[in-house]
Amino acid sequence: MILVLVGPPGAGKGTQAKLLCARFGIPQISTGDMLREAKRSGTLEKRYLDIMDSGGLLPDEAVIGLIARRTVEPDCSNGFLLDGFPRTVPQADALDELLASANQGGKRIDAVIQLDVARPLLEERLIHRRTDKRSGQIYHLVYNPPPPGAELEHRADDRPEAVAKRLDAYEAMTAALLPFYEQKKLLHRVDGVGKPEEVTHRVLSAIGRPGSGGE
């Protein structure tokens, strides 16, 4: 099964990706995680680092190559879930071309899931988000506060000015993506507000897999 999970920053894609991947036994491929790891390891070019820190979206060339290399690894043989890619119609076209290639064995997307969350809630989720420098665990100062002694980091792209820019950029760049997948009858819009398990149940029902994984 090949799933694409889309939604604005703060919609809960990372949480849902982990839950869905556990259900279907497929790996999560997060462009955000891959890019942040490249940033931490010092392998990300400075021009891309500057874009990330300011809350901008990276050009296609910085992302498509990562996806192409990752999706031919052995753990992707039975499918995978893409989190954060594609964001534009050109990226979606490139993904279709990649999946149809000989290296991929003529695969195709099974479903595209859009997590819908109102912008004010997205802003509140992101601005109060913190990351533990040592473990990488993500906390929320209000809803999921960190334990005492956690060494917290406020990501540059989670600061208020960067959050507004990220959401604006997402809305502008993905405006044509959802109609693209809707026309292909692949798009499933799901309310992303609620407990993680509730949202997962909505997703499974939307894609025709209610009760999947023993629920």
UniProtKB/Swiss-Prot annotation:
A cellular-component GO term for this protein: cytoplasm
Q: Where in the cell is it found?
A: Cytoplasm
Asked if the record carries the keyword DNA repair, the reply is no
Any GO MF annotation of the entry: adenylate kinase activity
Q: Where does AMP bind?
A: T31, R36, G56, L57, L58, G84, F85, P86, R87, Q91, R155, R166
SUPFAM superfamilies (UniProt xref): Microbial and mitochondrial ADK, insert 'zinc finger' domain, P-loop containing nucleoside triphosphate hydrolases
Residue span of region LID = 128-158
- EC assignment: the record states 2.7.4.3
Q: Domain annotation text?
A: Consists of three domains, a large central CORE domain and two small peripheral domains, NMPbind and LID, which undergo movements during catalysis. The LID domain closes over the site of phosphoryl transfer upon ATP binding. Assembling and dissambling the active center during each catalytic cycle provides an effective means to prevent ATP hydrolysis.
- Name the NCBIfam families on file: adk, PRK00279.1-3
Q: Which PANTHER family match?
A: NUCLEOTIDE KINASE
Which HAMAP family does this chain map to? Adenylate_kinase_Adk
Q: How does it assemble?
A: Monomer.
* Protein name, as recorded: Adenylate kinase
List the lineage, top down: Bacteria, Pseudomonadati, Myxococcota, Polyangia, Polyangiales
Quick one: which gene encodes this? adk
